[in-house]
Amino acid sequence: TTITKGLKKIGILKGNLNQLIEKEAYKTFYMHGIGHWLGMDVHDVGSYNNKKGDAREFEPGMVITVEPGIYISKKLKQVDNKWKGIGIRIEDDVLVTKNGNEVLSSKLPKEIADIEAAMLTV
């Protein structure tokens, strides 16, 4: 819903918000999952389901990413040229603990001005 609202606000998606959400119009720009396991490798292997096929429950010590984002193809005719070729994902890495979770990336910048300021330092 948040991504659809944002894409509508800047004019990339047009039409009735509820209809855009219902038809999953965001998927043109969000063609990936919400995250993945994080471990020994950047995209750690591991099943998202248990042996019965049900969603696997989180256990203390697991680390997952939460990384919503969008990618706007240069080939999309219905999109204004100023948006074409843009891609962004702002990731959080989350450690599952015995009592809940800990956002390992909580001190990293998330707001546009903060990200741009950080980019100027590299």
List the predicted regions and their residue ranges.
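Active-site neighborhoods and metal-handling regions in enzymes and metal-associated proteins
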Residues: 1-122
